[in-house]
């Protein structure tokens, strides 16, 4: 591809290639992927001058954590397979997010709200590299926001564990300590994630070009497209194909490397 230099950000893990000024992003990406073949290596071609971002906007389920919280809630009442099937179709963009969420939440009616604590303690695992991503960007002056189509009862806890400064999500309604089967309106879905990015930019005096956004589902696409660097992380092919950046192999530290951070810059 005519690179004039190779700079290792982490030996054997991530490197920068200095490309010719005339290099075209799509063509160079295709060339590099073809050269790598089946090697588990992610490729991002971008302008070095503008890659360091001032805002991080991240999805939660299957992005900052390894699970889908609504599927774990459903498992508590024996309907996980039914709910997970709807989740998968929604993530693929086969069905609209909002009606799919209402349908799944209705199946949780009567579930003891206290189960959330048990799920957080015993079932949820933080995605690899997530804490380093949030803490390193914060230490370098970035604003970090967890924006989820999931539920506040989980995002408040996960945001605290990872160090996000802000979190937004949907409200699972409960009465007398049990879920009612209803979700608070309006629902935070695909459009609301992009709106959250615009609101945060306006508040901070920045633009979407100053942001990096990461998610894995169809409801993340508007946010991913709007951000200066939009990342589809281990996403379904239909989602990954529409993102500026796709990470199929690496963990969340890839979002630091693609901004030019070296491994020794990472905080935990």
Regions found by a protein language model. Give the residues of each.
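Residue-level detector of short coil/turn "hinge" positions at structural boundaries
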Residues: 3-5, 43, 81, 144, ...
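Fold-independent oxyanion-binding glycine-rich loops
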Residues: 47, 60-61, 67-68, 73, ...
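C-terminal cap/substrate-recognition subdomain and adjoining C-terminal extension
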Residues: 30, 110, 115-268
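Residue-level recognition of short, well-ordered coil/turn positions
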Residues: 40, 94-95, 142, 205
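Short, surface-exposed acidic
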Residues: 6, 83, 113-116
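Long, charged amphipathic helices and adjacent flexible linkers at domain junctions
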Residues: 49-50, 54, 90-114, 178, ...
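Active-site neighborhood of HAD-like aspartate-dependent phosphohydrolases
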Residues: 52-95, 102-103
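Non-catalytic pre-domain segments flanking phosphatase-related domains
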Residues: 1-58, 267
């Amino acid at each position: 591809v005519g690179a004039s230099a190779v700079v290792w950000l982490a030996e054997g893990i991530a490197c920068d290639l200095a490309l010719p000024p005339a290099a075209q992003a799509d063509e160079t990406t295709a060339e590099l992927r073809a050269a790598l073949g089946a090697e588990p290596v992610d490729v991002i071609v971008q302008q070095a001058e503008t890659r360091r971002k001032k805002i991080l906007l991240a999805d939660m389920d299957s992005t900052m954590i390894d699970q889908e919280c609504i599927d774990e809630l459903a498992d508590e009442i024996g309907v996980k397979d039914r709910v997970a099937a709807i989740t998968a179709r929604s993530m693929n963009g086969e069905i609209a997010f909002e009606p799919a969420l209402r349908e799944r939440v209705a199946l949780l009616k009567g579930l003891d709200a206290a189960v959330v604590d048990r799920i957080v303690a015993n079932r949820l695992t933080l995605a690899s590299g997530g804490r380093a991503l949030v803490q390193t960007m914060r230490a370098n002056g970035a604003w970090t926001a967890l924006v989820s189509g999931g539920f506040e009862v989980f995002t408040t806890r996960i945001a605290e564990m990872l160090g996000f400064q802000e979190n937004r999500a949907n409200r699972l309604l409960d009465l007398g300590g049990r879920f009612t089967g209803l979700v608070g309106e309006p629902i935070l879905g695909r459009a609301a994630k992009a709106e959250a990015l615009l609101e945060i930019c306006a508040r901070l005096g920045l633009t979407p070009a100053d942001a990096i956004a990461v998610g894995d589902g169809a409801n993340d696409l508007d946010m991913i497209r709007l951000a200066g660097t939009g990342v589809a992380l281990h996403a379904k092919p239909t989602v990954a194909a529409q993102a500026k950046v796709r990470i199929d192999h690496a963990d969340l530290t890839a979002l630091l490397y693609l901004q030019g951070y070296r491994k020794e810059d990472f905080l935990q």
